[in-house]
């Protein structure tokens, strides 16, 4: 049991040193958000010795999220139970290595001290002393947004810890890094259609959830899409979000669907089957929660992903996320963004003035992808796909045909270079995925074992019968 009187927050050495290789999961790309801080947090300071433990506060989440058997929550509950005041403090954590630098601070891999089964967390450390008042408001925005989220494709805020001039946010750790780094490991920095459809579908569901809460993301890009250990995505960095009112609606939608059915006809004594097409009307009930009244004049985001209305400075709403979603699709397919110029200024001019987007690949599925991207990259947000009824309109597009959206979390992540996946064997424990070759060997071993037992039982039964008849014969 940890002695709370020994590891004082005032004695916590924030100068991080590790024998492990300093691996950063933040992309080395020059692309950055327009509201990005020029923060150069050295993390070589110690908390002032004048600080008392009473000034260190912690607000660990008290609600149990949907991941009921998540080992993270098990570790958190164990640590808070052993703590003298029932709260988490910085002294409870051990920093493992530096992961990268975000818009507002630095991120570290850490785990709880004295935990029998150490579980990795990402600790985002923000030095409030080096931030402007506007940047501090971004910190509070991100903390507020994180506290609202409960979704498999979004991070969980396990705790917020304020110590001296530091604010620390404890969230999920994603060992596979970000999607931008993963793209750079692929041939020509691009992905085939199938993985693109997988990642796009999960991002779409995450955006749908945010919009249902009235949250406009405004910073969608591969650098902000992290890959969990099981290969599924997690959006990150919510400091540029803004909230708006949203009124959920539940409507019945009528549409016509063309179907075909075989019909047998007799011609010249033969029996032939012909296809007869007919139209039928279907009524589908849809839930939609799009913040259509959202409005902001702040110019924030990443220049290559900015929507035309945002560049023009005339105000924008949730439609900027659907524009960015179209840019995101294009970059995954082509390895670059469609309006990229030689400079940031040229890129912004291209976004406002260029009407045509170049499409060169002709592989299977590109026709549907091209059509979806063109409908998302409509300069007038009133005509842009998704701006009226949100993600529901995008889900119905042919590019996503065949996806069972309620089961999206159960789809198997793609096999692509640089993606190391792990699967959950049972609740709370994670094990490496079994390779096909090992899987084949396991099945062979199992069948061999069962066959051996079957032969053993048969031999035993024959021997038993022989003994029985031998005994009966003697008795007779």
UniProtKB/Swiss-Prot annotation:
Keyword entries, A-Z: ATP-binding, Auxin signaling pathway, Cytoplasm, Developmental protein, Growth regulation, Kinase, Nucleotide-binding, Serine/threonine-protein kinase, Transferase
Family per similarity comment: Belongs to the protein kinase superfamily. Ser/Thr protein kinase family.
GO annotation, biological process: auxin polar transport; auxin-activated signaling pathway; cotyledon development
PANTHER family: FLIPPASE KINASE 1-RELATED
Reaction equation(s) it catalyzes: L-seryl-[protein] + ATP = O-phospho-L-seryl-[protein] + ADP + H(+); L-threonyl-[protein] + ATP = O-phospho-L-threonyl-[protein] + ADP + H(+)
Subcellular location(s) of the protein: Cytoplasm, Cytosol
GO cellular component annotations of the record: cytosol
Active site per the UniProt annotation: 219 (proton acceptor)
Entry superkingdom: Eukaryota
Tissue expression notes: Expressed in root tips and lateral root primordia.
Phenotype caused by lack of the gene: Enhanced root waving when grown on agar plates.
Known EC number: 2.7.11.1
Entry-linked SUPFAM superfamilies: Protein kinase-like (PK-like)
Keyword Flavoprotein in annotation: no
Full protein name: Serine/threonine-protein kinase WAG1
Role this protein plays: Serine/threonine-protein kinase involved in the regulation of auxin signaling. Acts as a positive regulator of cellular auxin efflux and regulates organ development by enhancing PIN-mediated polar auxin transport. Phosphorylates conserved serine residues in the PIN auxin efflux carriers. Phosphorylation of PIN proteins is required and sufficient for apical-basal PIN polarity that enables directional intercellular auxin fluxes, which mediate differential growth, tissue patterning and organogenesis. Acts as a suppressor of root waving.
KW Nucleotide-binding (keyword) present: yes
Other facts: Over-expression of WAG1 induces a basal-to-apical shift in PIN1, PIN2 and PIN4 localization, resulting in the loss of auxin gradients and strong defects in embryo and seedling roots.
């Amino acid at each position: 049991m940890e002695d709370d009187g020994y590891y004082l927050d005032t004695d916590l050495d924030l100068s991080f040193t590790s024998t492990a290789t300093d691996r950063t999961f933040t992309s080395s790309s020059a692309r950055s958000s327009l509201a990005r801080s020029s923060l150069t947090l050295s993390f070589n300071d110690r908390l002032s010795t004048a600080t008392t433990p009473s000034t260190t506060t912690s607000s660990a989440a008290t609600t149990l999220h949907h991941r009921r058997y998540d080992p993270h929550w098990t570790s958190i509950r164990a640590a808070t139970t052993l703590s003298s005041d029932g709260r988490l403090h910085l002294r409870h954590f051990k920093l493992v290595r530096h992961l990268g630098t975000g818009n507002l601070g630095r991120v570290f891999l850490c785990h709880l001290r004295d935990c029998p089964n150490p579980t990795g967390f990402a600790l985002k450390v923000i030095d409030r002393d080096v931030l402007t008042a506007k940047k501090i408001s971004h910190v509070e925005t991100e903390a507020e947004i994180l506290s609202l989220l409960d979704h498999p494709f979004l991070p969980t805020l396990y705790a917020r810890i304020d110590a001296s001039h530091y604010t620390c946010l404890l969230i999920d750790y994603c060992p596979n890094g970000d999607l931008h780094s993963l793209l750079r490991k692929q041939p020509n920095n691009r992905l085939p259609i199938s993985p693109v459809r997988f990642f796009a579908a999960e991002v779409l569901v995450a955006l749908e959830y945010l919009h249902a809460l009235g949250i406009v993301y405004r910073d969608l890009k591969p650098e902000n899409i992290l890959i969990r250990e099981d290969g599924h995505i997690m959006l990150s960095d919510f400091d540029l979000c803004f909230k708006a009112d949203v009124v959920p609606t539940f409507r019945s939608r009528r549409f016509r669907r063309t179907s075909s059915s075989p019909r047998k006809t007799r011609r010249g004594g033969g029996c032939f089957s012909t296809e007869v097409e007919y139209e039928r009307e279907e009524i589908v009930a849809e839930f939609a929660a799009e913040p259509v009244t959202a409005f902001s004049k702040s110019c924030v985001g990443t220049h290559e992903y900015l929507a035309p209305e945002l560049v023009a400075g005339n105000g924008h709403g949730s439609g900027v996320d659907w524009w960015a979603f179209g840019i995101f699709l294009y970059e995954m397919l082509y390895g670059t963004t469609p309006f990229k110029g030689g400079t940031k200024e040229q890129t912004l001019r291209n976004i406002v003035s260029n009407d045509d987007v170049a499409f060169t690949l002709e592989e299977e599925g590109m026709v549907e992808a091209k059509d979806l991207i063109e409908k998302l990259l409509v300069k007038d947000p009133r005509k842009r796909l998704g701006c009226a009824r949100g993600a529901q309109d995008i889900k119905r597009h042919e590019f996503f045909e065949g996806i069972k959206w309620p089961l999206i979390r159960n789809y198997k992540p793609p096999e692509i270079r640089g993606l190391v996946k792990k699967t959950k064997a049972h609740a709370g424990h994670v094990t490496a995925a079994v390779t096909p070759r090992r899987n084949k060997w396991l099945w062979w071993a199992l069948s061999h074992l069962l066959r051996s037992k079957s032969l053993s039982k048969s031999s035993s039964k024959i021997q038993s019968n022989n003994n029985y008849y031998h005994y009966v014969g003697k008795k007779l």
